[in-house]
Every structure is written in C-alpha cells, then in structure tokens.
A protein has these predicted regions:
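Generic recognition of flexible, low-complexity loop/linker segments
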Residues: 26-28, 81-83, 114-117, 154-155, ...
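Active-site mouth of glycoside hydrolases
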Residues: 1-105
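Aromatic- and carboxylate-lined catalytic core of secreted/periplasmic carbohydrate-active enzymes
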Residues: 134-137, 151-249
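Short, conserved catalytic or adaptor-binding loops enriched in Gly and charged residues
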Residues: 31, 84-88, 117-120, 244-246
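Proline-centered flexible-loop/turn and helix-kink motifs
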Residues: 33, 67, 123, 216-219
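Catalytic-core region of carbohydrate-active enzymes that cleave or remodel glycosidic bonds
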Residues: 67-68, 88-184
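Short acidic-hydrophobic sequence patches enriched in Asp/Glu that either
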Residues: 20, 54, 147-150, 203
Length: 249
C-alpha cells in the first residue's frame, strides 16, 4: 500500500510534518505489518534533490535499519530514486514510473536512461517499473490512446532493460474503479475510462497473463540485459528492441 500520497500539497506526503508523517506511518505498519505487504512510503511525489532529506528522515523514522517487509518509493514520472535512496538501509528496491507518455524523449529515458544504465551501481537493488503506460489511458503529451500493443512494449522493455525483477500493469478503468464510462476524478487530461468490470478482461490484461507464464517458464532471475544480441538496433527509441540473456549464456 501507498502510505503517504504526495501529488498535491493537501495530501499527507506534503501536508504533514516529518514528525506526524512518521507517526501515521508507524501506525500503518503496526496495523497491517503482519500481512504480506510491500510498503510504498511515498506515492507520486517528488523525492529528489532538496526533497530527499525529508523522505530519508521519514523512512528512517518509520522502518529503522531492518524493515520486516520490502519498502520502496513510487516517484512521479521519470524520476530516478536510485541515486538518492539506494544506500538507505530501509530502502529495499528501486521503483520508478516510466509514465503515460510515448514521446521519443520519454521512451528514451526508459531504454537508455537510468533503468538501463544504473542497474549495476552498488549497492545493488532490484529495479521495478511501478507505472508503465496504463491500458486505454490517453497520453496528454501526444494524444496516443494506449492499446494492448503499447502495454506489451512497455512491459517487455521494462523487464529486459534491467535485470528482470518485475513490472506492474494498470488499466485506466481499474485504477480509478470506474463504474460507468467516465473521466476519473482530477484526471481529465487522461480521457474517459471504461467500467472496471469490463476492463479486467481487456486484451492487455490477457497479454500480461501470457507474459507472466513465459517468464515463469524460465529462470528469469538469471537474466541480464545484453544489447549486443541485436546487431541492427533501430535508430529511434520508439522502435527499440530490448534483449537479455541468462548469466550462463
């Protein structure tokens, strides 16, 4: 669960003092910590640069040096928390958001930026794309309506540009719990969402099922990115072909 949403100034991740944020999060850990959870300390906020000390202090105050469950951050689009947080003892894995943007610049950040170049930096941390483009969401930057093909591209790239650890799938109608064809609250720029009970059976969701079956049939934890496998890589990031091989070849 996300512990402190931090998109707007009115949300707890921004509105609460460090002391109160720690108190609230400690309560959440006490209430739910016995379950098999992954703690996402901050949700959709800015955690880098001048903001990093505040979030480090909150993380240390809540989890100390040895959290009983995995802990990470869910940053805003194309923010890399690895540089500021990977050495924190409470920080378990690097979560990032490639986001809902299919411009050349955005895709290049995924396939040539930190997820693809920083994975070997020590101390090593698993790397997970926690928010690639959601199915049937509309990109406010390009106007693209992301379909199942866009879902597959984002998922395979996310799983292969870094050592395979996982990726998430989202649908515009599911994250918002849309009950009819409607525009999600405060998200007008992303377009209308279909009802969640239709969205759960979408083509993209079936693609992710097959992807999970494929990776589950191999020793996915041994995969490492290997760009040399593709001899003629397209010149544009939008057509980038991700490739990986096992450690033993």
């Amino acid at each position: 669960p996300v512990m402190l949403w931090a998109i707007w100034r009115t949300e707890p991740g921004q509105a609460l003092s460090e002391k109160d944020a720690i108190r609230l999060c400690r309560y959440l850990v006490a209430r739910w910590g016995a379950y098999n959870v992954v703690w996402i300390l901050g949700g959709d906020g800015s955690y880098l640069g001048k903001y990093a000390p505040r979030w480090k202090n909150i993380g240390r105050g809540v989890f100390g040096d040895a959290p009983a469950r995995p802990v990470t951050m869910h940053p805003g689009s194309r923010q890399w928390t690895g540089g500021d947080f990977r050495a924190e003892k409470w920080f378990s894995f690097i979560g990032y958001q490639s986001g809902h943007n299919d411009s050349e610049e955005a895709v290049k950040w995924l396939v040539e930026g930190p997820p693809a170049t920083e994975w070997s930096t020590r101390p090593a941390r698993p790397i997970v794309n926690m928010e690639p483009n959601y199915e049937e969401i509309t990109s406010p930057q390009t106007g693209t309506h992301f379909d199942a093909l866009a879902v597959r591209k984002a998922m395979y790239r996310s799983l292969l540009v870094s050592p395979t650890a996982g990726a998430t799938y989202g649908h515009h109608g599911v994250w918002s719990w849309a009950e009819t064809w409607e525009v999600p609250l405060n998200h007008d720029k992303f377009g209308k969402a279909r009802p969640w009970y239709e969205a759960v059976n979408s083509e993209g969701s079936q693609s992710v099922k097959h992807l999970a079956q494929l990776f589950g049939s191999i020793r996915w934890w041994t995969l490492r990115p290997d760009r040399e496998m593709v001899q003629n890589q397209p010149s544009t990031a939008l057509q980038f072909i991700a490739s990986a091989r096992s450690e033993d070849g």
